[in-house]
Structure formats: C-alpha cells, structure tokens
Regions:
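Cys/His-coordinated zinc-binding microdomains
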Residues: 329
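N-terminal and secondary-structure boundary signal
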Residues: 1-326
Length: 331
C-alpha cells in the first residue's frame, strides 16, 4: 500500500545530500514513474519575495535542482513559477528570480516562467472561491508539482502545501482577495478551493530549514532537517503541522480540509513512511493565527479608519444590470 506521506532526513543543502534525500523521499510514493518523455511539468515554488535562500522564506534552489535533474532524466521539460506580491511582470519577477537563486535552477535545465497572462474562471465545485483569476502559465502544464517551504504564518498559523497556491493569484490582486475573504475561515476555504482546482500531481516540502516567529517573511530561520512529500497537499500539511507541534485544529486550511473529508483529523491516521518523531520541533515559535486579515485589530483610530477605507474600496459589491433587474433585492 502506497504511503500517504514520506519523510526523510536532509541535514543540509549540500547538492549530494539534496539529491540523495530527493530520491529517497519519492520512492515510497512510487518515485517519478508517472513522468514520461515530452511531459511539461510546472513546479509551483514558493517565491514569496525577493529574498536570499539563506533567509529561509523561499524554496531552496539546491532541492529544486535535485528534482529538476530527476525530471529531465525522464525526458520532461520543466518550468518554475510563482506570483509573489507586487507587480506580476518581467521586471519584478526577474528581480525575485535573481534574489532567490533561481538562476541556478535555470542552469540545471528548468525554464523560469515569463508568461504573465491571466485567466478568470468559474469554479462551481468550490465551497468559497467560485470565481477567481489566476496565472495562466499553469494551463500549459501536463502536471503540477507543488514545492512548498515550511514556515510560520501570521494569519494561517502555518504556510506549506495548500497556502502555496495563493501564489497562483496575480501579485497585485492579492490584497483584493484578502479583503474579499477577510475571515480566516473564508480565506482558508479559498486556499483549499485553489489547491483542489489545480490538483498537484505531487507535493514536496522543503523543511530542511524552515521559518519560525513572524512568518512568512519576517521570521527567523529554524533548522528542521527534513524533506517531506505526498500526493496530497492536505495530508502533507497535516504531517508538517505535527512537526511544528500543531494539530489540524490549529491551522485553518487543515480545518477546512478535514471538514471536506480531504484528510484525516489526526496525524496518527496517516500512513507515513519515515520517522516523523525525529523531526518534531517542540519549541517552535508560531504566531497565533488571526481571525481576520484586516489591520487595526488593536482598536487604534488610524487603523480603524484605514481598515474602513480599504474595506469600502476593495470589498466586492453587486452591480445591478438595469435591463435584467427585476427588483427582488436578493443582491
């Protein structure tokens, strides 16, 4: 029976160590036997900001290179992509790619996404995000690999495989989505909808050095020493949350996934290959997940005024169509 989650030790970002760990973590999941020559694989990385690899905010290039080499050996073409906050254009992404060490991945044979087209879709099967706009380069993929970074997160408690899909929303649109889904539960539901819509074929977590404290960008690097993988973003998140001393109840995206039957509530119910207990970080400094994303939660006047103004500006509102409106007032 195939494992739900595979976890192996990876003590550093040494190239040989990364290659060994990558091969070892994928084996219990069937390896990369599903990859065939000519496939176009998009690796959805975490490039949250223009930060250096040693700052532990982004997926490390050495691990990416190990995966790229394995995929190229099977005849696949590989594209790396993400949409960090800010302008979704060549100038900004080039800056992020350079800072995060992605040129190393380019040298290993991967293309760095430079397609900045966008697409808006209806998603009738969603629980929350029934309509959203995303980065259309993903449409070219025969399969998506979600390669996330394990970090603390001020709103979601933890950012990992599911939260990584917020990177499909074009950068300048992200504040709009925060205001469209101001409550943590709604925002988490939106993230789960995105993860289900894009249905990654494989999810891998860089937990060699994670981030604790004021994540996802202003925290402190924390060595965990693990590489983890799963076919399920939700099950991977459940196992990784346990590493940080969290349960499904502590992470809004996991609560949403459990409610939808996408993963068990308890990590003990996962089929795990590897010793999860070897990677527990009992003193991990995690921020308390916030109930909303709005600023001014401490009640200060300027915060409340700014909050009110931004809510009025960004919150979606119905726009009646005079020719078809029947005056039912449901909107």
């Amino acid at each position: 029976m195939q494992s739900d989650v595979s976890i192996v030790a990876c003590g550093s970002y040494d190239p040989a160590e990364c290659r060994r760990a990558m091969e070892q973590v994928l084996a219990p999941l069937g390896g990369l036997d599903w990859v065939s020559p000519g496939m176009r694989i998009v690796i959805k990385v975490n490039l949250v900001s223009a930060m250096k690899p040693e700052e532990a905010a982004t997926t490390h290039p050495e691990l990416l290179c190990a995966l790229i080499e394995l995929l190229k050996a099977r005849g696949a073409s590989v594209v790396l992509g993400d949409s960090p906050g800010g302008l979704y254009n060549a100038a900004h992404l080039t800056h992020v790619y350079d800072a995060a060490g992605m040129r190393q991945c380019e040298a290993a044979g991967a293309a760095l996404n430079m397609d900045f087209s966008q697409k808006t879709v209806e998603n009738p099967n969603a629980a929350v995000a029934r309509r959203f706009t995303y980065t259309a380069y993903l449409d070219s993929a025969d399969a998506i690999i979600d390669f996330c970074k394990l970090k603390s997160h001020g709103m979601m408690g933890m950012t990992n495989a599911v939260k990584n899909f917020f990177g499909v929303i074009p950068g300048t649109m992200k504040p709009e989505y925060h205001y469209q889904y101001p409550k943590a539960e709604d925002f988490a539901g939106m993230l789960v909808d995105l993860a289900e819509y894009f249905a990654p074929r494989l999810c891998i977590c860089d937990a060699v050095v994670g981030m604790e404290g004021n994540g996802p960008t202003q925290g402190t690097p924390r060595k965990i020493g693990a590489l983890a993988a799963s076919a399920s973003a939700h099950k991977l998140d459940l196992a990784c949350a346990a590493m940080l001393g969290m349960t499904a109840g502590d992470v809004p995206t996991l609560r949403a996934a459990v409610q939808r039957g996408l993963c068990p509530e308890k990590v003990e119910d996962l089929r795990i290959t590897g010793d999860l207990s070897a990677f527990l970080v009992p003193d991990f400094q995690a921020p308390k997940a916030q109930g909303t994303v709005f600023f001014g939660q401490d009640g200060r006047l300027l915060g409340r005024l700014g909050n009110t103004a931004m809510r009025a500006f960004l919150t979606p509102k119905p726009l009646p169509q005079k020719k078809t409106c029947i005056g039912c007032a449901k909107c």
